[in-house]
């Protein structure tokens, strides 16, 4: 008879609680922990105060390629890659840290939530692992952005260098607020983050 380690179960519960607090859906919890579905349902209700949402996870790779979603998912993935390269940490921990960094640095929507939810961030990593999506460097700025895995690298221009016309209408930050945010990011990067 197989006996589960109490320490491993404790780590799984802690991980599940952290993922639930960040907005993870039940299939992610089942995939990343060894806890039973019934325990995860109870834990979800304890942490969130509501039952776990039902339904399928979003599964379209096209979502990550539209202009605003592409910028947000690329920012998250670049932070994730930096953490993987610099630190010797498990991928799930790198994902959580990169997502927390994304939440801290990227502006929230008017409804208060992030554009890139944790569920989509997790799915993005799965799409990249399965080589459905990948990264391509912009030929103008040199930044790495999410594209289809085998996108021709010599023609790609990112949404920053060539924004769609609707991008101007969606701007939520005033110039002063945007400049202040950029200044704060530069100060934080100079003080705390080693270059990747």
Curated annotation (Swiss-Prot):
GO terms for biological process: bacterial-type flagellum organization; positive regulation of DNA-templated transcription; regulation of bacterial-type flagellum assembly. One of its GO terms (cellular component) is cytoplasm. Its main location: cytoplasm. Its cofactor is Zn(2+). Keywords: Activator, Bacterial flagellum biogenesis, Cytoplasm, DNA-binding, Metal-binding, Transcription, Transcription regulation, Zinc. It comes from the Bacteria. Binds 1 zinc ion per subunit. It is found in: Cytoplasm. The keyword Nucleotide-binding does not apply. InterPro entries: FlhC. The keyword Transcription applies. GO terms for molecular function: DNA binding; zinc ion binding. Zn(2+) binds at residues 138, 141, 158, 161. This is Flagellar transcriptional regulator FlhC.
């Amino acid at each position: 008879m197989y006996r589960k380690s109490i320490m491993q179960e404790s780590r799984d519960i802690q991980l599940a609680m952290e993922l639930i607090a960040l907005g993870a859906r039940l299939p992610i919890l089942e995939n990343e922990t060894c806890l039973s579905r019934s325990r995860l349902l109870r834990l979800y209700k304890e942490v969130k105060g509501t039952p776990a949402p039902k339904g399928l996870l979003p599964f379209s790779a096209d979502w990550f390629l539209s202009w605003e979603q592409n910028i947000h998912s690329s920012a998250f993935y670049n932070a994730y890659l930096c953490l993987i390269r610099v630190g010797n940490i498990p991928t799930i921990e790198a994902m959580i840290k990169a997502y927390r960094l994304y939440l801290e640095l990227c502006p929230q929507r008017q409804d208060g939530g992030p554009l890139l939810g944790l569920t989509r961030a997790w799915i993005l990593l799965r799409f990249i692992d399965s080589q459905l999506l990948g990264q391509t460097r912009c030929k103008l700025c040199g930044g790495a952005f999410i594209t289809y895995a085998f996108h021709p690298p010599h023609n790609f221009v990112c949404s920053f260098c060539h924004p769609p016309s609707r991008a101007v209408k969606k701007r939520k930050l005033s110039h002063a607020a945007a400049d202040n945010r950029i200044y704060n990011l530069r100060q934080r990067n100079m003080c705390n983050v080693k270059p990747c």
